[in-house]
């Protein structure tokens, strides 16, 4: 399994629409950097957020998620409360090749401020916006800047094509647009 370079990322994005919109240069003056880098792509966070709150007094349950747990926010700067959490999404829309898995790591600019970014792997065949999980681990409010970098994606090409892709198994987050809340597939339990 090999880590893919800027040349490969550019080719896949321009020819096959792997990343849309695609920023060919790494933009970084006066902003949290984003765009193409040597061996990855720095994704941007859109201007829509879902901020967790305890106003509803409910328990967070991934199998039965209650939207009373969140407050919707749209704007250029999102303030994540102390020791709290927010969901966001990428500006970029991804179409993953069948033989490529992507992993995403938070940017050091935010990590050095106590802001942890988590994104689960982009599976082969996945298509959609990426939902981003943002944790403010500090006792202070934290700013997240919309339309700027939030994390870096690394692309790993498998030694062979997988037998079953995310698209083949009709993954529950396939073709997601916007911020997608937790989902549990209904049906027969095995």
UniProtKB/Swiss-Prot annotation:
Q: Which CDD domains does this chain map to?
A: trimeric_dUTPase
Q: What class of enzyme is it?
A: hydrolase
Which residues constitute the signal peptide according to the record? Answer: none
Disulfide bridges in this chain: none
Q: List the coiled-coil residues.
A: none
| Assembly, per entry | Homotrimer.
Q: What does this chain do?
A: Catalyzes the deamination of dCTP to dUTP.
Q: What is this protein called?
A: dCTP deaminase
Q: Gene encoding this polypeptide?
A: dcd
